């Protein structure tokens, strides 16, 4: 069946941008049972095993006042081959006429894999590049060098076969080390990078060509957000366009969200208002190390000035509460210290840990009845023993050597062969954050 339902091989020259869709028409000579509409149901029931059962192909067609029911590929026109005894008997007993039927499958029928298998050079099927990451209306591909001569045709096929996709792009270089953005080329569709992406019950709007976004991290975003409790204060040091900050804000978590990329900051501000979390999420545009140090006083001042954030239940729930004479507002105290620091810049976030040295110097009293903050730092690792490597790197930056039991090493995903992404979670030691800052 796999070989049968496949378009004919098509020779494709490199760097073509358009496909001749007529090349993908394929006609099958089949046999159909001609019956009255009243008998279709009974025939379907009795002859079920002998009917044509191809994916996305209907087996009943109208012809004048009668129905043509397609039989399986092996059925002969005289009914002597390819049919079960039950079907043969049913046809004879009901004087059903068998007629030839030509079924034509065209470009619209075939899936992207089918088309690419037909036009790309011979190779392992799973190697043909039909996979992509969807970001809003954009399909983001990362084509290997061997497929670059066929990149425009590949893009065209992906565009044609995915109705929600309007633009197909290919990454043309490695991620920029400063802002995690990368150069991309439009392979097919419109030249429009402004996307709206849904994730974690939030909407995010941004220019995909100017900011970092990875839809494959949605599970990791949700994992950390679930650890934040209403009324917690979270410092999102490398916040991007807000995938941690905005959903956390919807949970009534106070978030100070920062990103150095001015385009990310601009989108972050927009997304805060788009998701109606401005009371809980504050946006900043600073260097990460500088922000870690300055955010302590920012939150302390915010806590003293505002004291609490008032929230109201949704209107429908508010009406029910009013009927029950329950309060319809809630005051959420603003804590003076952060419960969590999120550092989602896996290429270099560990190097920013030195900024925590002395960040709460002279403020020990704030933690009299509070736990010390947790840090969630994302990082890449290329070593077979990730725990040893990551502990050494944390020590080199923070100046504190954790035991393996003091750090949660969470495996996030494989980024490339011999390159994995982890999230290291640990509690900041008092000996580090309360230490007297070293001048100069």
Curated annotation (Swiss-Prot):
InterPro entries: MeTrfase_TRM5/TYW2, SAM-dependent_MTases_sf, TRM5-TYW2-like_MTfase, TRM5/TYW2-like_N, tRNA_Gua_MeTrfase_euk
Record's subcellular location: Mitochondrion matrix; Nucleus; Cytoplasm
Xref: SUPFAM superfamilies: S-adenosyl-L-methionine-dependent methyltransferases
Top enzyme category: transferase
The keyword Nucleus appears for this protein: yes
GO annotations of cellular component type: cytoplasm; mitochondrial matrix; nucleus
Pfam families in the cross-refs: TRM5-TYW2_MTfase, TYW2_N_2
Keyword match tRNA processing: yes
Entry-linked Gene3D superfamilies: Met-10+ protein-like domains, Vaccinia Virus protein VP39
GO BP terms in the entry: mitochondrial tRNA methylation; tRNA methylation; tRNA N1-guanine methylation
Domain of life according to the entry: Eukaryota
A GO molecular-function descriptor: tRNA methyltransferase activity
Positions contributing to S-adenosyl-L-methionine binding: 221, 259-260, 287-288, 344
Catalytic activity from the UniProt record: guanosine(37) in tRNA + S-adenosyl-L-methionine = N(1)-methylguanosine(37) in tRNA + S-adenosyl-L-homocysteine + H(+)
EC number(s) reported in the record: 2.1.1.228
Family indicated by similarity: Belongs to the class I-like SAM-binding methyltransferase superfamily. TRM5/TYW2 family.
Main function: Specifically methylates the N1 position of guanosine-37 in various cytoplasmic and mitochondrial tRNAs. Methylation is not dependent on the nature of the nucleoside 5' of the target nucleoside. This is the first step in the biosynthesis of wybutosine (yW), a modified base adjacent to the anticodon of tRNAs and required for accurate decoding.
Subunit structure: Monomer.
The protein, known as: tRNA (guanine(37)-N(1))-methyltransferase
Native organism: Schizosaccharomyces pombe (strain 972 / ATCC 24843) (Fission yeast)
Taxonomic lineage from the root: Eukaryota, Fungi, Dikarya, Ascomycota, Taphrinomycotina
């Amino acid at each position: 069946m796999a070989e049968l339902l496949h378009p004919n091989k098509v020779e494709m020259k490199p760097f073509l941008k358009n496909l001749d869709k007529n090349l993908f028409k394929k006609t099958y000579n089949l046999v159909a049972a001609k019956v009255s509409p009243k008998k279709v149901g009974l025939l379907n029931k009795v002859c079920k095993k002998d009917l044509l059962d191809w994916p996305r192909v209907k087996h009943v067609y109208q012809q004048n006042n009668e129905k043509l029911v397609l039989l399986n590929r092996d059925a002969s026109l005289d009914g002597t081959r390819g049919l079960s005894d039950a079907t043969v008997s049913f046809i004879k007993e009901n004087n059903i006429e068998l007629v030839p039927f030509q079924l034509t499958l065209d470009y619209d029928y075939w899936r992207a894999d089918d088309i690419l298998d037909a036009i790309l050079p011979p190779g392992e099927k799973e190697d043909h590049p039909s996979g992509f990451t969807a970001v809003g209306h954009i399909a983001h591909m990362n084509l290997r060098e061997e497929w670059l001569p066929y990149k425009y045709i590949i893009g065209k096929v992906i565009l044609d076969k995915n109705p929600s996709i309007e633009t197909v792009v290919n990454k043309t270089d490695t991620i920029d080390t400063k802002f995690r953005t990368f150069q991309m080329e439009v392979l097919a569709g419109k030249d429009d990078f402004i996307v709206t992406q849904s994730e974690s019950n939030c909407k995010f709007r941004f220019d995909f060509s100017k900011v970092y976004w990875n839809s494959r991290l949605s599970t990791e975003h949700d994992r950390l957000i679930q650890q934040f409790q209403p009324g917690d204060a979270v410092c999102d040091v490398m916040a991007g366009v807000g995938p941690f900050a905005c959903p956390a804000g919807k949970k009534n978590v106070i978030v100070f969200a920062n990103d150095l990329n001015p385009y990310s900051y601009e989108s972050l501000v927009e997304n805060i208002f788009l998701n109606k979390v401005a009371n809980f999420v504050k946006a900043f545009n600073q260097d990460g190390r500088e922000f870690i140090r300055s955010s302590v006083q920012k939150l302390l001042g915010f806590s003293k000035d505002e004291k609490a954030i008032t929230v109201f239940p949704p209107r429908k729930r508010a009406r029910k509460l009013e009927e029950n004479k329950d309060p319809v507002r809630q005051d959420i105290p603003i804590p003076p210290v952060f419960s969590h620091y999120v550092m989602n810049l896996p290429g270099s976030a560990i190097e920013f840990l030195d900024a925590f040295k002395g960040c709460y110097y002279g403020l020990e009293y704030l933690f009299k009845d509070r736990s010390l903050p947790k840090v969630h730092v994302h990082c890449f690792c290329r070593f077979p023993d990730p725990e040893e490597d990551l502990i050494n790197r944390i020590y080199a930056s923070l100046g504190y050597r954790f035991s393996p039991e003091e750090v949660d090493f969470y495996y996030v995903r494989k980024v490339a062969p011999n390159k994995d992404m982890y999230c290291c979670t640990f509690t900041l030691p008092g000996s580090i954050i309360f230490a007297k800052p070293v001048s100069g």
